[in-house]
């Protein structure tokens, strides 16, 4: 057992009120220091999924809803995406427009595609009020499909999804740090809602709680600024704080609706935004998307690859790219790393030669 200092007074030279380099106050907490199993596992991540508008018809046949990207989604030991629709037939719309819901067959489509769990930390899960959230969780339970990031109270919303792969325990924490449609959408002790941390300390606490019992901790967060291809200063500050708290992987989605840079931030791996995966309208920035595949060994990401894809203007599905189109997309993705301030290699690694071109996947740089 080790002491991890994240608020005042933990034997720091600064004494009371000392803080980390990011300004996060120190708080003494006890975490399990036992080494993660020296056994490689693979984790897969992709972005936002909406079964609305042009993508609603995809659920007519759930087995084909994710098209040719199914192999990339099903290959990793664990795959997670972001569901942006309430699964409900009831409730009352809360917005004048832009209320999104889908039938329960969405869970069948996700399962058929090889997705293992989804974050529902989007405020769209409350587009039809608390009833929409209750129905979403009930439908997921009936389907036997894991959802996380929202619930009947704050404890349920911040509770990580925990799974095991090859004997390695993985905890995935969902957060939403974007401005919510209504303040009441944030889960509280006596109110249903999404995992919307009031401050950085609450986000850090969620990571620490997960770290107590998991070999690998992933934070899957909605954040950022609309249509931005570079992460905001707020994203960078939060990523650093989460990494300092013990997050091994930090994956973003949500507001950007486009790819942002990915790479190592110290020993943690950060993908600031994976954009849209199955989407109801065209992006004004770029249709680029894809599936991120990470190899984790001993609790640290040792390798990363990316299957580039493009959201179809006809169906809204992400279609994997091949040949020259894939090479060009990978080059664009790698270029986004510069403004993200991330490294193309894990700490201590020797610079590697440029990867050989891949028809549908390869290292993002």
Language model regions located:
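N-terminal export and membrane-targeting signals
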Residues: 1-2
């Amino acid at each position: 057992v080790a002491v991890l200092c994240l608020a005042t007074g933990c034997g720091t030279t600064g004494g009371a009120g000392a803080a980390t380099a990011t300004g996060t106050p120190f708080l003494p907490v006890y975490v399990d220091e036992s080494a993660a199993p020296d056994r490689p596992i693979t984790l897969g991540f992709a972005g936002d999924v909406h079964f609305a508008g042009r993508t609603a018809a995809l659920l007519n046949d759930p087995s084909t809803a994710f098209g040719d990207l199914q192999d990339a989604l099903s290959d990793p030991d664990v795959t997670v995406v972001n569901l942006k629709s309430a699964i409900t037939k009831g409730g009352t719309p809360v917005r004048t427009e832009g209320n999104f819901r889908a039938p329960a067959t969405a869970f069948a489509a996700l399962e058929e595609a090889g997705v293992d769990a989804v974050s529902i930390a989007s405020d769209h899960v409350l587009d039809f009020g608390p009833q929409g959230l209750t129905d979403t969780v009930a439908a997921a339970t009936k389907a036997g499909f894991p959802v996380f990031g929202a619930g009947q109270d704050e404890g349920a919303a911040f509770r990580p999804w925990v799974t095991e792969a090859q004997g390695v325990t993985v905890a995935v924490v969902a957060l939403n740090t974007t401005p919510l449609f209504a303040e009441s959408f944030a889960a509280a002790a006596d109110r249903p809602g999404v995992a919307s941390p009031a401050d950085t300390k609450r986000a850090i606490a969620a990571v620490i709680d997960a770290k107590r019992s998991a070999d690998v901790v992933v934070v899957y967060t909605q954040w950022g600024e609309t249509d931005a291809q570079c992460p905001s200063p707020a994203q960078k500050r939060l990523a650093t704080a989460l990494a300092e708290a013990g997050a091994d992987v930090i994956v973003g989605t949500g507001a950007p609706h486009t790819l942002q840079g990915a790479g190592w931030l110290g020993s943690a791996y950060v993908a600031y935004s994976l954009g849209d995966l199955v989407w109801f309208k065209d992006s004004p920035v770029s249709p680029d998307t894809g599936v991120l595949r990470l190899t984790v060994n001993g609790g640290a990401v040792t390798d990363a690859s990316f299957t580039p894809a493009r959201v179809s203007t006809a169906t809204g599905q992400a279609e994997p790219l091949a040949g020259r189109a894939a090479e060009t997309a990978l080059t664009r993705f790698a270029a986004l790393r510069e403004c993200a301030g991330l490294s193309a290699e894990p700490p201590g690694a020797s610079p590697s030669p440029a990867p050989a071109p891949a028809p549908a996947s390869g290292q993002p740089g």
